[in-house]
A protein has these predicted regions:
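Short, hinge-like loop/turn segments at secondary-structure boundaries
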Residues: 23-25, 76-77, 105-108, 171-174
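Active-site beta->alpha N-cap acidic-glycine motif
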Residues: 1-80, 128
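Active-site-adjacent pocket scaffolds in enzyme catalytic domains
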Residues: 125, 133-209
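Metal-dependent polysaccharide deacetylase catalytic core of the NodB/CE4 family, i.e.
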Residues: 55-139, 157, 192-194
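Active-site flanking residues adjacent to catalytic metal/cofactor-binding acidic residues
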Residues: 6-8, 90, 153-155
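Alpha-helical packing segments of well-folded alpha/beta enzyme cores
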Residues: 39-49, 111-119, 142
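Surface-exposed, active-site-proximal loop segments in enzymatic domains
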Residues: 19-28, 94-106, 201-203
């Protein structure tokens, strides 16, 4: 029987590559740490959705989001209300598109270590050492440092014709996949069909929309 893993990335507008973390795409930074109206609407919608079913859900949290008190109160409330169904994974210290930048194992390792400490300290028993690369930018060189930092499951591979560049310059998703297998990192890939995404932000783009 096929099982579906329900996951949500907790990105606000200030986190996305258009505004942050990408060497060429980030043109207009959003300096405010306040939650956007759209994100707040999503928080309320997510909470309502949780009340309509009994399925477990994983939230991938960016550590810098924990600097916002409103988000922290909301997330703590979700964990308290649905503690047996909610798990919290790591979506990075910030939302930096790591594979779009030159390889920097030391800085990447430091950022993941800090993120794990901050997120696990907040989420407690609901934290899991699971990782999803910010904006899906995941290169082969990032795999071994993740394992060294204690990550046991990765969910970054989105093997779509629209996301090939996110594996890093000259790399392929198969190389990321092979590296995960070599070091024993369990990979849970994004669902695709006909090499196109069936979920995620790409569904807002024509013709998938």
């Amino acid at each position: 029987m096929t099982q579906t893993w329900l996951t949500v990335d907790c990105d606000d507008f200030r986190h996305i590559p258009k505004h942050y973390g990408h060497p060429t795409r980030s043109k207009s930074p959003i300096l405010s740490q306040e939650l956007s109206p759209e994100f707040k609407l999503g928080m309320r919608g997510f909470e309502h959705w949780l009340s309509t079913h009994e399925n477990p859900v994983t939230l991938f949290v960016i550590a810098d989001s924990l600097e916002n008190q409103e988000f922290c109160l909301w997330l703590k409330g979700i964990i308290t209300e649905y503690s047996n169904r909610i798990t919290i994974g790591c979506h990075g210290l910030t939302h930096k598109s790591w594979s779009a930048w030159p390889e920097d194992v030391e800085q990447f390792s430091q950022s993941i270590t800090q993120a794990m400490e901050q997120i696990s300290g907040f989420a407690g028993e609901n934290f899991r050492p699971w990782f999803r690369a910010p904006a899906g930018y995941m290169a082969p060189w990032m795999v071994a440092p993740l394992v060294d930092c204690g990550i046991t499951v990765d969910s970054s591979i989105n093997d779509s014709i629209l996301t090939r560049v996110k594996a890093g310059g000259g790399n392929t998703w198969q190389q990321v996949r092979d590296t995960c297998q070599q070091v024993g990192l369990l990979e849970r890939e994004w669902l695709t069909k006909w090499r196109l995404p069936v979920n995620g932000p790409a569904l807002s783009l024509f013709p998938l929309s």
